[in-house]
């Protein structure tokens, strides 16, 4: 990268409306970018049509705007980036860094749940096959700005993981790396549920010969059952009314200072003060339920 300016991003999938857990990730990445006088980009990760909800992407963008989280530049849509992903796959193939695999989930489960390289040297064709990375640069640990050095699950880190699915869809790890590199992302601020795939993504950066970004993984908001707030767990959508109470609730969750007279501030001024007071070192590492705050 020739530009040393901070560039962050928020990259939701359009599988439903934003909820409080989504707001934490969006707000954390926004504040980190603005506190570093940086750029904050938004990307819609719409590469998995079976999981997408019609109209959700437009709703997400309206929600961000309503909550004062205004992004820089154009929104990047992964559904418009297929050619870039194909080029990346072609390059990996030309370098001998990928191969086709016809192993089923049942077979992988039968050998312990970690792919054992069964198809690595079989020279299979593309028919009814997934494409796997031929892992030559496993990443066994990485540094997180909040959590310090994180150690990977070594068998998982060494696994030849899928980069193009059997059903013809591009794998998440490939798409996110290609797009983060394309957008010049210098730091990724996101939820702790994405810690595990980070070593795979850094490994892809190394295979491509690209500089990996820095990482900061935020704690997850939990529901009353101790599960992550998510669209799959039917977390309620963000309220459509006054956005300020939810922003304050998210700031409290992130252990940030709250202006005493926040009710007198409009949303833009509230966020400006949040940027000025932003201290990521104060964020608690553990997941928690919002009701406990």
Curated annotation (Swiss-Prot):
InterPro entries: Glu-Q_tRNA(Asp)_Synthase, Glu/Gln-tRNA-synth, Glu/Gln-tRNA-synth_Ib_cat-dom, GluQ/Sye, Rossmann-like_a/b/a_fold. It is an enzyme of class 6 (ligase). Keywords: Aminoacyl-tRNA synthetase, ATP-binding, Ligase, Metal-binding, Nucleotide-binding, Zinc. One of its GO terms (molecular function) is ATP binding. Its EC number is 6.1.1.-. It comes from the Bacteria. ATP binds at residue 231. It holds the Pfam family tRNA-synt_1c. Binds 1 zinc ion per subunit. Its cofactor is Zn(2+). Zn(2+) binds at residues 101, 103, 115, 119. Disulfide bonds: none annotated. A motif ('KMSKS' region) lies at residues 228-232. One of its GO terms (biological process) is glutamyl-tRNA aminoacylation. The keyword DNA-binding does not apply. A motif ('HIGH' region) lies at residues 12-22. GO terms for cellular component: cytosol. L-glutamate binds at residues 9-13, 45, 172, 190. SUPFAM superfamilies: Nucleotidylyl transferase. HAMAP family: Glu_Q_tRNA_synth. Catalyzes the tRNA-independent activation of glutamate in presence of ATP and the subsequent transfer of glutamate onto a tRNA(Asp). Glutamate is transferred on the 2-amino-5-(4,5-dihydroxy-2-cyclopenten-1-yl) moiety of the queuosine in the wobble position of the QUC anticodon. Belongs to the class-I aminoacyl-tRNA synthetase family. GluQ subfamily. This is Glutamyl-Q tRNA(Asp) synthetase. It comes from Klebsiella pneumoniae subsp. pneumoniae (strain ATCC 700721 / MGH 78578). The gene is gluQ.
């Amino acid at each position: 990268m020739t530009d040393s300016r901070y560039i962050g991003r928020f990259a939701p999938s359009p599988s439903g409306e934003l909820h409080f857990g989504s707001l934490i990730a969006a707000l954390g990445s926004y504040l980190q970018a603005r506190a570093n006088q940086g750029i904050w980009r938004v990307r819609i990760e719409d590469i998995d049509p079976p999981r997408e909800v019609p109209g959700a992407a437009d709703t997400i963008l309206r929600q961000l705007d309503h909550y004062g989280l205004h992004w820089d530049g154009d929104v990047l849509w992964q559904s418009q980036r297929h050619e870039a992903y194909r080029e990346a796959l072609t390059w990996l193939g030309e370098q001998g860094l990928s191969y086709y695999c016809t192993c089923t989930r049942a077979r992988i489960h039968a050998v312990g749940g970690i792919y054992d390289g069964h198809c690595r040297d079989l020279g299979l064709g593309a028919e009814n096959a997934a494409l796997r990375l031929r892992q030559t640069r496993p990443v066994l640990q990485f540094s997180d700005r909040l959590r310090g050095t994180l150690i990977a699950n070594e068998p998982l880190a060494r696994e030849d993981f899928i980069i193009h699915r059997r059903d013809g869809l591009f794998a998440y790890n490939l798409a996110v790396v290609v797009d983060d590199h394309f957008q010049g992302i210098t730091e990724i601020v996101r939820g702790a549920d994405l810690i595990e795939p980070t070593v795979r993504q850094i490994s892809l950066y190394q295979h491509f010969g690209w500089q990996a970004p820095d990482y900061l993984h935020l704690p997850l908001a939990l529901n009353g059952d101790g599960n992550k707030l998510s669209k799959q767990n039917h977390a309620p959508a963000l309220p459509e009314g006054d956005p300020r109470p939810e922003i304050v609730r998210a700031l409290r969750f992130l252990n940030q200072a709250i202006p005493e007279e926040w009710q007198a501030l409009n949303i833009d001024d509230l966020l400006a003060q949040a940027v000025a007071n932003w201290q990521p070192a104060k964020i608690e590492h553990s997941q928690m339920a919002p009701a406990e705050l």
